[in-house]
Amino acid sequence: MNGDEDWLTVGKVVAAQGMQGELRINPSSDFPERFTLPGQRWLKERNGEPRPIELLTGRQLPGRSLYVVKFAGVNNRNAAEALVGQKLLVPSSDRPSLAEGEFHLLDLVGLEARLQAEGPAIGHVIDLTTAGNDLLEIELLTGRRVLVPFVEAIVPEVQLNQGWLRLTPPPGLLEL
């Protein structure tokens, strides 16, 4: 597995936690088991190659979207801090199967954003933020970036095969 298409980014190491080598992970996956079930994962620096690492334990922080994980061989705060900023990966083949009409949130990145199904693009989805509600970061054709809540009332239609999604934003949302 060499190309980026062989890997799924499921989170990012955002901080060290405590003195025993635990790490805080900001998830980009809707599947908690990616952070809680022991087993092999991979870490990747910005321009580096993925390298295997063993997940020993993981738990979600109460009331937060962050996870705290413990990897084999990361036994102190200095070792943990050296991993901050790296992406947590799994092989693309580990992608869970979905029911009809469902999709993986990461598949939304790159889609055109439209106001009407047959209308022109107003921008593209460039990123996804997992918070209380998932937020799509859309870069408008003007170059400005806006955050759009990924809820059915605002994003009522997603056409993955055709490469677009439709927005029905409340007044002012795209002007923020």
From Swiss-Prot:
InterPro entries tied to this protein: PRC_barrel-like_sf, PRC_RimM, RimM, RimM_N, RimM_N_sf, Transl_B-barrel_sf
Location in the cell: Cytoplasm
Lineage top rank: taxon: Bacteria
GO annotations of cellular component type: cytoplasm; ribosome
Pfam family, one: RimM
UniProt family annotation: Belongs to the RimM family.
Description of how the protein assembles with itself and partners: Binds ribosomal protein uS19.
Entry-linked NCBIfam families: 16S_RimM (TIGR02273)
Protein name, as recorded: Ribosome maturation factor RimM
Protein's organism: Prochlorococcus marinus (strain MIT 9313)
